[in-house]
Amino acid sequence: MLGLAIMAISFIFMSYSPKPELIFDANHMAVGVKDRENKLVIHADKIPAFNRTYWANWFGQKDSMVLPLENNIF
């Protein structure tokens, strides 16, 4: 019963926490940022499909736009 209470509290906190403005992945040299419409845009040369889907779901989206990594980001 205690486990269900902890899960419920965690779900409530997760629902009310703000979405991140920026996500950085050093392993894949990828950056995800919100655009003006609060949609996720990923800047990376290559990013695994799992990471792309995970980041998009984190922002509450089904998919995200992936743009090539530009020299001015890093």
From Swiss-Prot:
Protein name: Uncharacterized protein RC0016
Lineage of source species: Bacteria, Pseudomonadati, Pseudomonadota, Alphaproteobacteria, Rickettsiales
